[in-house]
Design a protein with these regions (language model features):
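Bilobed periplasmic-binding protein-like "clamshell/Venus-flytrap" ligand-binding domains
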Residues: 25-29, 76-113
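Periplasmic binding protein-like
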Residues: 1-49
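Aromatic side chains
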Residues: 10, 25, 34, 39, ...
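A local structural motif
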Residues: 1-7, 68, 72, 81
Length: 135
């Protein structure tokens, strides 16, 4: 294997990724909503320029069946049926192997004793709306 590492700023790299002009890249993507729809729409739905569909689909993955399941899961009100839809989607994505899932990043977060109201968030976001500083 012959590899050339090319560090890039994200704004330079993103159009290259969306146009399938890179063979590989490394990045994490946390779940910001505790719901599969936001993640799967961004990462695995077929990229459609000018829409939110596939806005983070840097694997250039396209599957009509997965696209169909994404739409079905997003509009399904029954939690059990919704889970079945997402499990089927997960199975298809796993079989197609559009990406190599390497790791889950570990985070260490700390704050000064002057910081109050802050707690780590399981969705990887830094929520500051309840934070305040003491003297």
């Amino acid at each position: 294997m012959d590899v050339t590492v090319q560090p890039s700023e994200y704004n330079t790299l993103k159009p290259l990724l969306l146009n399938c002009e890179r063979q590989a890249f490394l990045r994490d993507w946390g779940d910001s909503a505790f719901d599969p729809v936001g993640y799967v729409e961004a990462k695995w739905q077929t990229y459609t320029p000018g829409t939110a569909a596939g806005r983070g689909n840097y694997a250039c993955y396209s599957s009509p069946k997965v696209d169909e399941l994404i739409k079905a899961g997003a509009s399904e009100p029954d939690p059990d049926r919704r889970q079945e839809i997402y499990f089927e989607m997960q199975r298809l994505i796993h079989e197609d192997a559009p990406a190599v899932f390497l790791y889950v990043p570990q985070e260490i977060e700390a704050a000064s004793a002057r910081v109050h109201g802050w707690e780590p968030s399981p969705d990887s976001r830094i929520n500051l709306h309840d934070v305040w500083l003491s003297e």
